[in-house]
Design a protein with these regions (language model features):
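Membrane-embedded alpha-helical core segments of multi-pass
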Residues: 51-59, 109-110
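Phosphate/pyrophosphate-binding loop motifs in nucleotide- or prenyl diphosphate-using proteins
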Residues: 226
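Membrane-water interface segments at transmembrane-helix boundaries in multipass membrane proteins
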Residues: 1-52, 82-102, 135-223, 231-247, ...
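Conserved kink/hinge residues within transmembrane alpha-helices of Major Facilitator Superfamily
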Residues: 57, 111-112, 256, 294
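C-terminal ends of transmembrane helices
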Residues: 3-6, 59-65
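Alpha-helical transmembrane segments within multi-pass membrane transporters and channels
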Residues: 93-135, 296-298
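Small-residue-mediated transmembrane helix hinge/kink sites in multi-pass secondary transporters
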Residues: 61, 86, 115-116
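Short, non-helical or kinked segments that cap or interrupt transmembrane helices
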Residues: 62-81, 120-126, 265-272, 291
C-alpha cells in the first residue's frame, strides 16, 4: 500500500540528508568558535555548558533513543562521575587524566547495578524505578557527611593541567603560557576546557555511531521496537539492556568528572531531578535516536535559557510553551524518525510476464 503524505518514513531520507548537511558545518563552527572575532570568556563558557549537555544527551540517547529504556534518573550517573573524580583527586591526589576513566568505569558499574533489578520492567514502571534511583543517589551524597561533606559539598577540587603544565598567570617556564611562550591569560584555561569537553563529546558520538551499525546497536533498536520479538529471535535481552545502561552511564560519568573539575565545587543541589528532566527533554526534543538532533536541541535549549535570562521567572514559561509548540509541530523531535540504522531495501513488484517456466 502507498504511504500517506504524512507518514514519517517518507521524511526519513530528507531529514537524514539535512542532518548530513548540517553536521559538518556545525562541527566546523564548533572547532573554531574560541578564535572567532568578538568571542570572549562568556561565549566560551557558554559553549562549554552547551557541549556538556550535548554529551549528556548523547549518553542518555543510547538508553532512551536507541534501546527504548525510559530513564528518569540519568543525573545519578552524572553525580557518581563528579563525586568519584572529586574524592579521588582530593583524597588520593590523582590527576584528572587518571580520575577521568575511573569515574566513567565507576558510573558504568552503577549502571549495571541499576540494570539488573529493572530487567523485566518497561514503560512507566521502569521510569518510576530509575527516578527513584536518581533520588537515592542524591539523598546518599546529601546524608553521607563524613565522605561527601553533605549539603555543604566539596570545594577545592583540582583543575586539570595541560599534561602537567598548570594554567598559571605567573608566566614561569613550567606553566602553560611560559612553556609555549604566550602571554599569560585566564582565557587559556577556558579554551582548554572547551576543547576538552569537545573531545569527550566527539568520543561519545563516535562510539555511539560505531555501535549503531554493530550487532549490539541493531539489537538495541530491535529491542526498542519489540522486545518480545527480540526474545523470539534469540537476542540476549539481559546483555542488551545492561550494555545500554552501562555505556550510557559511563558517558554520564565522564561528563560528571568534567563538571567537577570545571566548577572546582560540587554539591547535591547540582544533581536534582530537574537535571534529569532537562537531559531527557534534550533527547526528546532533538529526536530520539538522532545524534545531530540532540546536538541541535542542546544548543537551542541551553542557548535559549541564556537568551531569556533577563525574563527571570518568565523564562520557564517561555521554555515550556516552546517545547509544547515544537512537540505539536514535530512529534518525533527536530530530527527524529526512529528508522533503523540498517534497513532492508524497498520491495518492488515483479511483472507477471517475467515469472514463468524457464525464467
Amino acid at each position: 500500500a502507498a504511504r500517506g503524505a504524512g507518514d514519517p518514513h517518507r521524511l526519513a531520507a530528507p531529514l537524514a540528508a539535512a542532518g548530513r548537511a548540517i553536521a559538518p558545518a556545525l562541527l566546523a563552527l564548533t572547532l573554531v568558535l574560541p578564535f572567532l572575532p568578538g568571542v570572549g570568556r562568556y561565549e566560551i563558557d557558554l559553549g562549554i555548558l552547551v557541549l556538556t549537555y550535548v554529551m549528556l544527551g548523547w549518553g542518555l540517547n543510547i538508553v532512551v533513543g536507541l534501546a527504548g529504556l525510559l530513564d528518569l534518573g540519568y543525573v545519578a550517573f552524572y553525580a557518581v562521575g563528579a563525586y568519584a573524580y572529586a574524592l579521588l583527586a582530593l583524597n588520593f591526589g590523582l590527576s584528572f587524566w587518571v580520575c577521568l576513566p575511573l569515574a566513567g568505569i565507576l558510573a558504568a558499574f552503577w549502571g549495571v547495578l541499576l540494570g539488573f533489578p529493572v530487567l523485566r520492567l518497561r514503560g512507566d514502571y521502569l521510569a518510576i524505578v530509575t527516578l527513584a534511583f536518581g533520588e537515592i543517589i542524591r539523598i546518599v551524597v546529601t546524608n553521607w557527611v563524613s565522605l561527601t561533606n553533605g549539603p555543604n559539598g566539596l570545594s577545592g577540587i583540582p583543575r586539570p593541567s595541560f599534561f602537567g603544565l598548570p594554567f598559571s598567570m605567573s608566566g614561569e617556564p613550567d606553566t602553560f603560557a611560559g612553556y609555549f611562550g604566550l602571554t599569560p591569560s585566564p582565557l587559556h584555561r577556558f579554551i582548554f576546557l572547551y576543547y576538552l569537553i569537545l573531545a569527550l563529546a566527539l568520543l561519545t558520538n563516535w562510539v555511539t555511531l560505531r555501535l549503531r551499525r554493530q550487532p549490539l546497536g541493531r539489537a538495541w533498536e530491535a529491542m526498542r521496537e519489540d522486545e518480545v520479538a527480540c526474545r523470539a529471535l534469540g537476542i540476549n535481552i539481559t546483555v542488551t539492556k545492561l550494555t545500554a545502561f552501562a555505556l550510557g552511564a559511563m558517558f554520564g560519568g565522564f561528563a560528571g568528572a568534567f563538571f567537577a573539575t570545571r566548577q572546582a565545587f560540587i554539591s547535591p543541589e547540582s544533581f536534582t531531578f530537574i537535571e534529569s528532566a532537562m537531559i531527557l527533554a534534550i533527547v526528546v526534543l532533538g529526536g530520539m535516536g538522532s545524534q545531530i538532533g540532540v546536538a541541535i536541541a542542546a544548543l537551542v535549549m541551553i542557548g535559549g535559557f541564556e537568551l531569556f535570562r533577563d525574563l527571570a521567572e518568565w523564562r520557564m514559561l517561555v521554555f515550556g510553551g516552546t517545547m509544547v509548540l515544537i512537540m505539536v509541530l514535530r512529534p518525533r523531535g527536530l530530527v527524529g524518525t526512529r528508522t533503523p540504522s540498517i534497513a532492508l531495501g524497498r520491495r518492488r513488484t515483479i511483472d507477471a510476464s517475467l515469472v514463468g517456466e524457464g525464467r
